[in-house]
C-alpha cells in the first residue's frame, strides 16, 4: 500500500507479540516507519456510504477491550487480516482424521493420512511459510503415493510436549526410507533460549539448540530415523527444554 502511494497509519495486533514473520515486520513495517501497536484491536467503524474512521482500543490478556483506552483514528480504508487455515473439505468428506493443532490431516513421514492411500501436502496439510516447503511436500507425497501401491506398512506414532504448537509428521512408517525425514514445527508460544529434544523409548538420541522460537515462524529440520533405531512400538517423543534464567 505504501509503495502505491497510500499512507498507512498503523498495524494493530491483538496479541502481545507479533503474529507476522520477523523479516516481514522489518521489511514491511520498520523500513517504512509504519507503527505496530501490540495488544490493540479495532472495536468500531465509522461512516455511512464509505469508511471515515475506526475506533481502536487496548485489549487485556483475554483479548477483551479495556474500557477507557479507546481512541478514534480518521481513515478511509481498513484491512482486516484473519490468518490462514488449511482447506480440507475434500479430506473431511472422505473421513480423513484432522489434527486439531494444524487443522490439516494427521500424516506419517511420507505424508500419507490415516486412511491408506490418501496423501496430503502443501497448505492443505499445514500452513507453510515458504512456497519451497509446499513444493517439496508435493514431490514427497507424489513419490510416496507411487511407493504405497506395492508395500505394507509398520507405523509408530510421533508425540510432542505441550510447548509445541504442532509438529508434522505425526507418524513414521518403518517400512519406508526414513534416512532423511523432514519435520516442520511451531512453538506454542514465544520462547527464549531453548533446546528441542528427541527421545526414543525414554532415551535422548538427538537435540538442537535455538536462540528463540516464535509461533509465526515455522521451523524445519531433517533427521535420519533409520540410524536412530526405531523399533516396533517405539515411543518417539519430542519436547522443548527452556533454558533456566
Where do the PLM segments sit?
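A short alpha-helix-loop-beta-strand transition element characteristic
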Residues: 5-10, 97-100, 153
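FAD-site-proximal beta/loop scaffold in flavoenzymes
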Residues: 77-128
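A conserved FAD-binding loop/helix module that cradles the flavin
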Residues: 121-169, 242-244
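Exposed aromatic-hydrophobic patches
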Residues: 184, 216-228
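Short, aromatic- and glycine-rich surface loops/edge beta-strands on solvent-exposed regions
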Residues: 196-198, 226-245
Amino acid at each position: 500500500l505504501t509503495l502505491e502511494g497510500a499512507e498507512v497509519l498503523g498495524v494493530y495486533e491483538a496479541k502481545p507479540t507479533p503474529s507476522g514473520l520477523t523479516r516481514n515486520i522489518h521489511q514491511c513495517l520498520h523500513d517504512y516507519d509504519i507503527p505496530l501497536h501490540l495488544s490493540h484491536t479495532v472495536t468500531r467503524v465509522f461512516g455511512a456510504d464509505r469508511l471515515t474512521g475506526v475506533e481502536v482500543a487496548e485489549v487485556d490478556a483475554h483479548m477483551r477491550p479495556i474500557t477507557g483506552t479507546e481512541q478514534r483514528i480518521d481513515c478511509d480504508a481498513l484491512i482486516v487480516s484473519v490468518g490462514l487455515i488449511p482447506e480440507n473439505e475434500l479430506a473431511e468428506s472422505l473421513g480423513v482424521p484432522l489434527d486439531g493443532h494444524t487443522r490439516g490431516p494427521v500424516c506419517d513421514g511420507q505424508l500419507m493420512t490415516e486412511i491408506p492411500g490418501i496423501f496430503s501436502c502443501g497448505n492443505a496439510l499445514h500452513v507453510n511459510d515458504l512456497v519451497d516447503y509446499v513444493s517439496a511436500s508435493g514431490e514427497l507425497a507424489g513419490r510416496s503415493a507411487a511407493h504405497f501401491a506395492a508395500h505394507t506398512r509398520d507405523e509408530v506414532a510421533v508425540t510432542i510436549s505441550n510447548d509445541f504448537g504442532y509438529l508434522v509428521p505425526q507418524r513414521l512408517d518403518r517400512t519406508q526410507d526414513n534416512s532423511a525425514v523432514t519435520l516442520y514445527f511451531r512453538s506454542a508460544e514465544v520462547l527464549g533460549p531453548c533446546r528441542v529434544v528427541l527421545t526414543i523409548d525414554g532415551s535422548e538420541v538427538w537435540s538442537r539448540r535455538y536462540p528463540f522460537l516464535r509461533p509465526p515462524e515455522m521451523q524445519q529440520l531433517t533427521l535420519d530415523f533409520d540410524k536412530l533405531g526405531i523399533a516396533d512400538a517405539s515411543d518417539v517423543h519430542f519436547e522443548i527444554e527452556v533454558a533456566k534464567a
